[in-house]
């Protein structure tokens, strides 16, 4: 189940249900808000597309928060030729996998393979899969 500060693409519910039965918080922010969060939480004074913040497991509470930069999601979607909702689906998947313990920095491609599998299973555009930096 997703707890969100705004409306969101319905495919996110399907992705969340595929990966976990726990609740996850989803927050949409602007470039400037994301820059502030990234600076305050990670010491990096720049914007980014998605951040995830896992929480210690407590029954009936969210397992973490996913923060998505809608400004960057929109511009990346335009650049790659798919919808903003599809870009948000990839960013949500990426953030949720981090919350669930995946780490693309150290997993020899396991997280990326999982993202590709989910994107294909959901019938999302190949432009989400064929890209750098995720």
Curated annotation (Swiss-Prot):
One of its GO terms (cellular component) is cytoplasm. GO terms for biological process: rRNA processing. Keywords: Cytoplasm, Endonuclease, Hydrolase, Metal-binding, Nuclease, Ribosome biogenesis, rRNA processing, Zinc. Its cofactor is Zn(2+). GO terms for molecular function: metalloendopeptidase activity; RNA endonuclease activity; zinc ion binding. PROSITE patterns: UPF0054 (PS01306). Its EC number is 3.1.-.-. InterPro entries: MetalPrtase_cat_dom_sf_prd, YbeY, YbeY_CS. Zn(2+) binds at residues 94, 98, 104. Binds 1 zinc ion. Pfam families: YbeY. It is found in: Cytoplasm. Its main location: cytoplasm. NCBIfam families: rRNA maturation RNase YbeY. Belongs to the endoribonuclease YbeY family. Single strand-specific metallo-endoribonuclease involved in late-stage 70S ribosome quality control and in maturation of the 3' terminus of the 16S rRNA. This is Endoribonuclease YbeY. It comes from Campylobacter fetus subsp. fetus (strain 82-40). The lineage of its organism: Bacteria, Pseudomonadati, Campylobacterota, Epsilonproteobacteria, Campylobacterales. The gene is ybeY.
